[in-house]
Amino acid sequence: MSLPGLDLTQPSADNQFAPAPPTQVSLSKGSEWRFEVAFGTVIRVKLLAGTAELFGTELAPSQTYTFSGTKGAIYTWHGCTLEVGAGDTGPSVDGLAPGGLSGATPRGLGAGGCQSEYTAEETPMVEYANVHFALETMRQEAKATGKDGPRVLILGPENAGKTSVAKILTAYATKVERQPIVVNLDPTEGMLSVPGTLTATAFRTMMDVEEGWGSSPMSGPSAVPVKLPLVYFYPMQNPLEAEGSVYRPIVSRLALSVMGRMAEDEEARETGIIVDTPGALSQGKPGSLEMINHIVTEFSITTILVIGSERLYSLMMKNYDNKPTSSASAVASDERITVVKLSKSGGCVDRDAAFMKGVRESQIRTYFFGNPIPSTASAALSLSASSTTNVTLSPHAQQLDFNTLSIYNYTIASLEEDEDEYDPSQLGAGDSFLPGGGNDAEASQAQQDEPARATPLPGIVSSIESATPPVASNVPLKKVLPPAPSTLANSLIAITNAPTTASAAEVRDASIMGFLYVAEVDSEKGKIRALAPVGGRVPPRAIVWGKKWPGEVVGLVG
């Protein structure tokens, strides 16, 4: 386009941001290539020569992998050559901006458009590999003696690389045909689920290089076998909210399910579990040490890995090192806890609030719409000749009558909320939050006396039926009564496996069937427009509102 009065041509946006040609990155033995890619920017990485891995999962040679909104590191044990190039801008999905809900981000100046990228010679990968070999020795001993395998707890502050270590240990275990159960106790970001969930998954097959942990069951082809997570909903960011009165029983319920799986699955029992924790537990806040002790006890932890905190390591050594575990067989087998300090990788970077917001929005978008970014690696690995290079899902929108839904909301007051969010009348020990009200005190007492049954992982029936977790007298769950609140719009609601007549404690402790996204609320007509991952009627189950966390998600649908 010519500018008035000047014989000049304004460069078009396509020419101004034309991608640079691919760049080759050569890595020497024992080094890694660290990179950061913004949301809305796509880079393509291909392994040309040698061997390399991303968080323990090997890259296939001559296959192109795509990354967007990622901070990662590709490591090589023997040296390799990578080709890094720019990909197309992430496509929009039903009005979603290419860069996620926050909008597109300008392409970086690094190779392929990375915001930052460099080669590092000093890495802690040898330490992490040694941990894997030590765990493998314990697994071999467990198989020979009939004991349980190692139960590993990973602790450390925010942005210390805890999840990366969990991925590495999981990937190395699956390489030697082990089946670890991985537990995510961090509600700030989901594992095979949306943010605000605590999950447990048995990993039998390889992990996905591009998707991180992989993907849960979906309608469509998948190059990597899907994983089957057991999901619990904790719609709060901090596990210490209300002094941990909500987080603690959910952790107990999840631990009961995991132990039930190990009791029924010989491979899982021999391999053990890997528990990833939120950084909030390592900040020394009141109640954090008590919560760590609760996790150590419930999961019968045998190995505690501490990353990036000398103070926390000292406390863990004092409280747990060489102490007996809480396992039932600890006395007979003299099973004791080992505390190990690991170095924090220099590649760990701070993830600001804007980036974490993009991560949450991306996980929620992927849950409903799939991953629209093309991947030639996924197409090459797929067994279907007609499969596409991306997984695009088509969620189902429907109108729901608010009066027919049993929606609950946590009424925990925090400093960030308005005073009108807090209703002391809902926190009593009475039956005011039972669906429909009522005065069945005898039924409530009978429920407390009834043994709790652990919800097993998919495909496994738990044999543990007599364990009874502590029953809280005050469960801060309140049923949301008509008219439908306008703040329900643009938020997630979780459909539990609890019936609509369940008590507040049963709703809190129930596993999750799936999630709905509330796109619109019509308070006058008593209708809500919701987005579901599958079509059909919404099952008659108790529903929990994720008002506090992951909070409002604007612009998911037009």
UniProtKB/Swiss-Prot annotation:
Give the keywords, sorted: ATP-binding, mRNA processing, Nucleotide-binding, Nucleus
The record ties this protein, via InterPro entries, to: Clp1 (IPR028606), Clp1/Grc3 (IPR045116), Clp1_C (IPR010655), Clp1_C_sf (IPR038238), Clp1_N (IPR032324), Clp1_N_sf (IPR038239), CLP1_P (IPR032319), P-loop_NTPase (IPR027417)
- The record's region (Disordered) falls at 1-25, 418-455
Predominant location of this chain?
nucleus
The subcellular localization recorded is: Nucleus
What GO biological process terms are annotated to this protein in UniProt? mRNA 3'-end processing; tRNA splicing, via endonucleolytic cleavage and ligation
The molecular function GO annotations come to: ATP binding; polynucleotide 5'-hydroxyl-kinase activity
Provide the residue positions that the database annotates as binding ATP: 32, 71, 159-164
| A Gene Ontology term for the protein's cellular component | mRNA cleavage factor complex
Q: What's this protein's family per the entry?
A: Belongs to the Clp1 family. Clp1 subfamily.
Say what the protein does: Required for endonucleolytic cleavage during polyadenylation-dependent pre-mRNA 3'-end formation.
Q: Cite the record's note on assembly.
A: Component of a pre-mRNA cleavage factor complex. Interacts directly with PCF11.
Q: What is the recorded name of this protein?
A: mRNA cleavage and polyadenylation factor clp1
Species: Aspergillus oryzae (strain ATCC 42149 / RIB 40)
Q: What is the lineage of its organism?
A: Eukaryota, Fungi, Dikarya, Ascomycota, Pezizomycotina
